[in-house]
Swiss-Prot record:
SMART domains documented for this protein: EFG_C
Lineage of origin: Bacteria, Bacillati, Actinomycetota, Actinomycetes, Mycobacteriales
Enzyme Commission number(s): 3.6.5.n1
Chain's role: Required for accurate and efficient protein synthesis under certain stress conditions. May act as a fidelity factor of the translation reaction, by catalyzing a one-codon backward translocation of tRNAs on improperly translocated ribosomes. Back-translocation proceeds from a post-translocation (POST) complex to a pre-translocation (PRE) complex, thus giving elongation factor G a second chance to translocate the tRNAs correctly. Binds to ribosomes in a GTP-dependent manner.
Keyword Lipid metabolism tagged: no
Pfam families: EFG_C, GTP_EFTU, GTP_EFTU_D2, LepA_C
Family assignment from sequence similarity: Belongs to the TRAFAC class translation factor GTPase superfamily. Classic translation factor GTPase family. LepA subfamily.
Protein name (Swiss-Prot/TrEMBL): Elongation factor 4
Length: 653
């Protein structure tokens, strides 16, 4: 081994020395003052509540929430340039591909105002109508909300819905216009629109660009000044609200909480107040923006808990966590104000390969922890075999759940057409709840009740006529109309939920050239003249194709489905009738023509009686085949007939 001589050793700088810049060359301007001392300040927990600000960003889908959150992460120094990526907080592949936020994410940010260090907890929320429950749970953990509006598009229906959710919880609202760098931006006009709705002055509306970062530091300053600090009693028994929970393959259930009273430390025994289940805390930590273990969480702080529990039903969103280890004991009463999310749409999910049924059950178990609103129960279909009847918040929720099952768990699935929940009163006085057309009672039905929703549509005023026509064709009743500005109008309708869960949104977008936005909320139920339409193949009902539709549109639905199945089902050796029926009454019919083998091909000339004999023999065979033959519906036909597009045709109920 060669060793360099002492002269060479002296001349060569040490590895440590090479890292240190010369005092003369040190650039004192970079990095900014904001970054160095504070990140270490934010990593310490048990921060005084007066120095904490909990806030969320609420906006319509695609108004730039995640991009603004990216700029905040960079500006506060918690993510460096090298590890930065677009939509940093959107962790799922589906979120990144579709450019939407599905899960609410939280992150702890350091910030300094007037030489005082603060900790900001930012909760990035989804904007789509299906994920309103994610927004409501994020709002429970905050004292303030940044209301973000696209300076080129203005206020949309979803913005209003989330704003009302925030006002219900008495959150302080900071109005902000985003995308002011766009050539099409009109900030003055939309600032006046926001001021009109919130009740502030147009000058108070902040203007930022999530893309360039312009105005973001001013926004963070305003969050510190305007959002009230969290209130809570540090000496009271521990109470923390679960606002999200995820399943980690290696660590089990990771529960995200906001501490309201007391404090939480590792190695304590905690209790979930709704179930009474107790666990030992293995780890307590903060998200900044990657998870970091810490000594514990104090009043007003947001972080995560790991108990090592693998059962996905042990950590319910909206539940209250309390500590059993402290001298003060467990809390006497749970936190209030959270509603369990209720499924609005039901659909059957079946594995294409029947042997995947146990895998589908395990996959749904794991997804349910991430997704508090997903419900499911086993069901059997004659046509599709074993599967699950799943409850979803809406059609996008259903599509994304199915896509996650297929992508994350490698399953191949068929989903049946979506249904809402109907209440059916029979003549004998009994009442049943129907989420599946195959549960529809046969015989005398006195009344049927269907869920209705209050729908808000915001669109340019030139499209009023076409929107009204669409809503009336879907049995909607106009509740009111307001002009937000001379160019934009808000329409309020009461509509059956069954009419809007299929293709209403697509039809609305196509009729308004994509300018309309939609929001809906539950509004009870109403009596309706509904019937069950069965699709019969060879005289036998195929349960997967049955649907509950309004009496006036049953004939159109029957026609549409029989025509579609005639194209999708391959021809058999015998003629197959495809019929649509209400009870025993046939309302539509198509025939799938038989494939005919040429039995005369071997007869070259000869007597006609020979040919007739062969044809009669073929006819007898076809007749016998028709009585004993079964129609095999290929998997592709089920997929095509039950796809969302096909369901969209059914939406004309």
């Amino acid at each position: 081994m060669r060793t360099p001589c002492s002269q060479h050793r002296r001349d060569r700088p040490s590895a440590i020395g090479s890292q240190l810049p010369d005092a003369d060359t040190l650039d004192t301007r970079q990095p900014p003052l904001q970054e160095i001392p504070i990140s270490s300040f934010a990593d310490k927990t048990f921060t005084a509540p007066a120095q904490i600000r909990n806030f969320c960003i609420i906006a319509h889908i695609d108004h730039g929430k995640s991009t603004l959150a990216d700029r905040m992460l960079q500006l506060t120094g918690v993510v460096d340039e090298r590890s930065m990526r677009a939509q940093y907080l959107d962790r799922m592949d589906i979120e990144r591909e579709r450019g939407i936020t599905i899960k609410a994410q939280n992150v702890r940010l350091p910030w300094r105002v007037d030489k005082t260090d603060y900790v900001l907890h930012l909760i990035d929320t989804p904007g789509h109508v299906d994920f309103t429950y994610e927004v409501s749970r994020a709002l429970e953990a905050c004292e303030g909300a940044v209301l973000l509006v696209d300076a080129a598009q203005g206020i949309e229906a979803q913005t209003l819905a989330n704003l009302y959710l925030a006002l219900d919880r008495d959150l302080h609202i900071i109005p902000v216009l985003n995308k002011i760098d766009l050539p099409a931006a009109d900030p003055d006009r939309y600032a006046a629109e926001m001021a009109h709705i919130i009740g502030c002055e147009p000058a108070e509306v902040l203007r930022v660009s999530g893309k360039t970062g312009e105005g973001v530091s001013d926004l963070l300053d305003e969050v510190v000044r305007q959002v009230p600090p969290p209130q809570g009693d540090a000496e009271a028994p521990t109470r923390a609200m679960i606002f999200d929970s995820v399943y980690d393959i290696y660590r089990g259930v990771v529960t995200y909480v906001r501490v309201v009273d007391g404090k939480i430390s590792p190695r304590e025994r905690i209790m979930m107040m709704s179930t009474g289940a107790t666990h030992e805390l293995l780890e307590v930590g903060i998200v900044s923006p990657e998870p970091k273990p810490c000594e514990g969480l104090g009043v007003g702080e947001v972080g995560y808990l790991i108990t090592g529990v693998k059962d996905v039903r042990q950590s319910k969103v909206g539940d209250t966590v309390t500590s059993l280890s402290r001298a003060r004991g467990a809390a006497a009463e749970a936190l209030t104000g959270y509603r369990e999310p209720k499924p609005m749409v039901y659909s059957g999910l079946y594995p294409v390969d029947g042997s995947d049924y146990p895998n589908l059950r395990d996959a749904l178990d794991k997804l349910q922890l991430n997704d508090a609103a997903l419900t499911y129960e086993p069901e059997t279909s004659v046509a599709l075999g074993f599967g699950f009847r799943c409850g979803f918040l809406g059609l996008l929720h259903m599509e994304i759940t199915r896509e996650r099952l297929e992508r994350e768990f490698g399953l191949d699935l068929i989903s049946t057409s979506p249904n809402v929940v109907y209440r059916v009163h029979k003549d004998d006085g009994t009442e049943i709840r129907v989420t599946n057309p195959s549960d529809w009672p046969e015989g005398k039905i006195r009344t049927v009740y269907e869920p209705v929703v209050k729908t808000t549509i915001i669109a340019p005023s030139e499209f009023i006529g076409t929107i009204m026509e669409l809503c009336q064709s879907r049995r909607g009743e106009l509740g009111g109309m307001d002009y937000l500005s001379p160019e934009r109008v808000e329409l309020r309708y009461t509509m059956p939920l069954g009419e809007i869960i299929f293709d209403f949104f697509d039809a609305l977008k196509s009729r308004t050239r994509g300018y309309a936005s939609l929001d809906y909320e539950e509004a009870g139920e109403q009596e309706a003249a509904l019937v069950k339409v069965d699709i019969l193949l060879q005289g036998e009902a195929v349960d997967a194709f049955s649907a509950i539709v309004h009496k006036d549109t049953a004939y159109a639905y029957g026609n549409k489905m029989t025509t579609k199945l005639k194209e999708l089902i391959p021809r058999q050796q015998f003629e197959v009738p495809v019929q649509a029926a209400i009870g025993s009454k046939i309302i539509a019919r198509e025939n799938i023509r038989a494939i005919r083998k040429d039995v005369l091909s071997k007869c070259y000339g000869g007597d006609i009686t020979r040919k007739r004999k062969l044809l009669e023999k073929q006819k007898e065979g076809k007749k016998r085949m028709k009585t004993i033959g079964r129609v095999e519906v290929p998997q592709e036909a089920f997929v095509a007939a039950l796809s969302t597009d096909a369901a969209g045709d059914k939406g004309k109920k």
